[in-house]
Amino acid sequence: MAHKKAGGSSRNGRDSESKRLGVKVYGGQAINAGGIIVRQRGTRMHAGENVGMGKDHTLFALVDGHVKFATKGADKKHLVIVVPAAA
């Protein structure tokens, strides 16, 4: 009788789910207080005026306004700022 031995199982074939990181609201766009601006790993971008940082380094707006991106210092750190909407 013809037989075929069982093949070994592959060690590959897995992949982690994407984390959907990145900029969620771009420069000049309006944002409400509490809205997420950037999801990131580590502080690639830093919180500027009217911007808070979550424990996973997510940047979010503290006030209603418009998002602005800037650089700061000699090492050109990326800064995220929310310019408050006129009251």
Curated annotation (Swiss-Prot):
The record's annotation in Gene3D superfamilies points to: 2.40.50.100
BP GO annotations? translation
Name the InterPro entries on file: Ribosomal_bL27, Ribosomal_bL27_CS
**The keyword Repeat is annotated on this UniProt entry:** no
Top-level taxon: Bacteria
Family matches, as Pfam families? Ribosomal_L27
Chain residue ranges for the region called Disordered: 1-21
What GO CC terms are in its UniProt record? cytosolic large ribosomal subunit
- Single GO molecular-function term? structural constituent of ribosome
Q: Which UniProt keywords apply?
A: Ribonucleoprotein, Ribosomal protein
Q: Which family does it belong to?
A: Belongs to the bacterial ribosomal protein bL27 family.
> How is this protein named in the record?
Large ribosomal subunit protein bL27
Q: Which organism is it from?
A: Burkholderia cenocepacia (strain HI2424)
Highest classification ranks of the organism: Bacteria, Pseudomonadati, Pseudomonadota, Betaproteobacteria, Burkholderiales
The gene is rpmA
